[in-house]
From Swiss-Prot:
The lineage of its organism: Eukaryota, Viridiplantae, Streptophyta, Embryophyta, Tracheophyta. The keyword Zinc-finger does not apply. One of its GO terms (cellular component) is chloroplast thylakoid membrane. GO terms for biological process: photosynthesis. It is found in: Plastid, Chloroplast thylakoid membrane. This is Photosystem II reaction center protein L. The chain crosses the membrane at residues 17-37. It is a single-pass membrane protein. One of the components of the core complex of photosystem II (PSII). PSII is a light-driven water:plastoquinone oxidoreductase that uses light energy to abstract electrons from H(2)O, generating O(2) and a proton gradient subsequently used for ATP formation. It consists of a core antenna complex that captures photons, and an electron transfer chain that converts photonic excitation into a charge separation. This subunit is found at the monomer-monomer interface and is required for correct PSII assembly and/or dimerization. Its main location: plastid. Keywords: Chloroplast, Membrane, Photosynthesis, Photosystem II, Plastid, Reaction center, Thylakoid, Transmembrane, Transmembrane helix.
Length: 38
């Protein structure tokens, strides 16, 4: 019997949270860069 590996689910969750973190940093960096460069 083959069961789904919980490690694969953990890797997928970490990858998704990493992408959300990068997106959040990018969204926050745009107004800060506009504020600093003006």
């Amino acid at each position: 019997m083959t069961r789904p590996n919980p490690n694969d689910q953990n890797v997928e969750l970490n990858r998704t949270s990493l992408y959300w973190g990068l997106l959040l940093i990018f969204v926050l960096a745009v107004p800060f860069s506009n504020y600093f460069f003006n």
